[in-house]
Structure formats: structure tokens, C-alpha cells
Amino acid sequence: MKHLVASSILGVFVLTPSLAMMNIRFNHPLYGSFGTQIIHIGAFQGMVSIRDNNIFSEWDGILDYKNALLVAKVFNKMACVLARMDKAVFPSLDDISKALDKQAFKYYPSTRGLTYTVLPSWVKNLAQYGKPIKNMCRDDPTYFAQQQKEGTALAIDSNSCFEIQLLSFMGLFICGETPGL
């Protein structure tokens, strides 16, 4: 019994610092380097969370790499948009992490011009997309969006589009004629 207690206490003292170092290694906050964005990478969870406090385009977002989902909460529209993330087009979680570590954004291909069209259907059960997405969007209507194929002409008023900029290499447009957007 004494050995069990001693090994448990030793395990706590040995494991706790190593787990703390792992947490620091996998979570890279970026404060103010790109205007008002704060970026948090949780590599273990496979998620990137973004907060942009720009008064002209305030939004929060989650890139869920494990489930290939992206969600954006657009504050001035009081709505959330949920879409499938095309992993072939988006920088990998590792690329974003390396870019934050090295501030080497110029080496990553631009995704400017990706356009998502908001569909009129609401997301009825946010819980199925995970707790972070549910918590972000629980107080606002959440709509599905679909990525437009490159070169496809939009039959949407360009004034209905909202631009989301992540770092310097990812620009997205969310367009739609849905209430709130």
C-alpha cells in the first residue's frame, strides 16, 4: 500500500510538469500581430480558435481539423455559419502552428477568394458538432454554408458578403440572403 501511495505521489510530481510543457507546446496564442486577432491552436484537440475584435468585422471562429468543420460567429449579423472545411485548400494545423512559431506567413499559399454561400436551413442540433461549436453558437441562429467551386459565378448580391481574414494567408467570404446575414 505504501508503494502505491508513493508511486502515485511521484507520478503526480513527475507527470504534472511534463503535461504543462506539452500544453504550452501545443497552444500558441498570437496577440496583436495581425490587428486585433487572437489565435489559439489546440493541436491535441485538432482545433484552431480565432477571435477578431476589429470593430468593423468582429467575429469568432473555430477550425475543427478532426471533423473537417469550420464555424464563424459573425457578431454584427448575430448569426453563426457552419461549413465543411476542404482540407486540400486550407493550410494544415501543422502549417498554421509553424507559421505562428516562425511568423513565416509569406511561405504559405493564399486561400483568398474562398466563398461560402449560406443556405436557408438552420442547424437544429448543434451538439452533434461538438461542445466548442455548440458553446460558440448556442445563442445565435446557425446556418449551413456550402463552399462555391472556384470560377463559379455567384447569383448573390456581393453586398451580402462578409469577409473573414485569418492571418495573412487565409481569406474567406461568407455570402447569403438569410435573415441576419
Swiss-Prot record:
Signal peptide: 1-20
Origin: domain of life: Eukaryota
Keywords assigned by UniProt, alphabetized: Disulfide bond, Secreted, Signal
Methyltransferase is among the record's keywords: no
Residue ranges of domain BRICHOS in the record: 53-145
Gene Ontology cellular component terms for the protein in this record: extracellular space
Protein purpose: May inhibit gastric epithelial cell proliferation.
Name of this chain's protein: Gastrokine-3
Organism annotation: Homo sapiens
Gene name per UniProt: GKN3P
